Amino acid sequence: MPAENSSAADSLDDDDYPAYTMGRAADVLGATPAFLRAVGEAGLITPLRSEGGHRRYSRRQLRIAARARELVDQGTPVEAACRIITLEDQLDDALRLNREIRRELDEHGADT
């Protein structure tokens, strides 16, 4: 396979590749472009910009926006939903780090 085709195929598998326009992203989420702008303004996701300045979203960003949409649909204000998701992500990171430290301590604890 030629190099340029390999690169294009790699982009299809990349969760961070900005493949979705604002309109398409809104359709996928069942949301409005205004909702996407709101989660962007709240700092939850930062879409990339095309050369023409249009917002482009990745699959990872759409998953995050979908979680915000779930919270908003349950009655949570957009800003609060974004904060909740940020805190959930921070908690996941802290728990993961805690597990790694405990694993290292368990491995080295037997040596001391």
What are these regions (language model features)?
Residues G23-A25, G30:
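Compositionally biased, low-hydrophobicity segments enriched in charged and small polar residues
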